């Protein structure tokens, strides 16, 4: 999903979204979640992984970060500063696995599906007011709904959360 601020992490709205994402991760942790699975995508996946690694390093050594990358060369075309953050995040993670051996058209979706299949609850930064597209993120949310997963949807600009039990539809 695209955000109004694009990839500008200096934008105030991005900072606020990242703070709320951190809050939701801590709420999940307080509710017993000890393993966080990410697809390591540029954006929310990387932000979430960095938040979890920060918590692991500072206060919660029992927390686990498990990275399911779409394929091994995922970050090849990323900007150098993002590649550096990506590889640091992978270095500090508990476990790493590439879902696909090489880049294929739906590799990102396959990584999301792997995570959804293993998860008890799925935390998404998502705007349900925007019509769904064929993006990997939209298809992953539809997949999570179809798998009857519990969802925590964080609205990227309103910074509200919507918790959806496994039996309900997010839309």
Question: In which residue ranges do the predicted regions lie?
Answer:
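Acidic/glycine-enriched connector segments
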Residues: 1-171
């Amino acid at each position: 999903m695209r955000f109004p601020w694009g990839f500008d992490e200096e934008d105030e709205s991005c900072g606020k979204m990242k703070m709320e994402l951190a809050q939701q991760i801590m709420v999940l942790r307080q509710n017993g979640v000890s393993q966080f699975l990410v697809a390591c995508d540029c954006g929310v996946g990387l932000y979430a992984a960095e938040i979890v690694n920060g918590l692991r390093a500072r206060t919660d050594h029992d927390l686990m970060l498990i990275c399911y990358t779409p394929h091994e060369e995922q970050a090849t075309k990323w900007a150098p500063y993002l590649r550096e953050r990506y590889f640091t995040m992978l270095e500090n993670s508990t476990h790493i696995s590439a879902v696909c051996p090489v880049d294929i058209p739906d590799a990102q979706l396959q990584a999301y599906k792997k995570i959804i299949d293993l998860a008890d609850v799925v935390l998404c930064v998502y705007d349900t007011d925007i019509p769904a597209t064929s993006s990997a993120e939209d298809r992953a949310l539809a997949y999570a709904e179809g798998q009857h997963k519990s969802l925590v949807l964080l609205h990227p600009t309103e910074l509200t959360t919507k918790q959806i039990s496994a039996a309900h539809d997010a839309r």
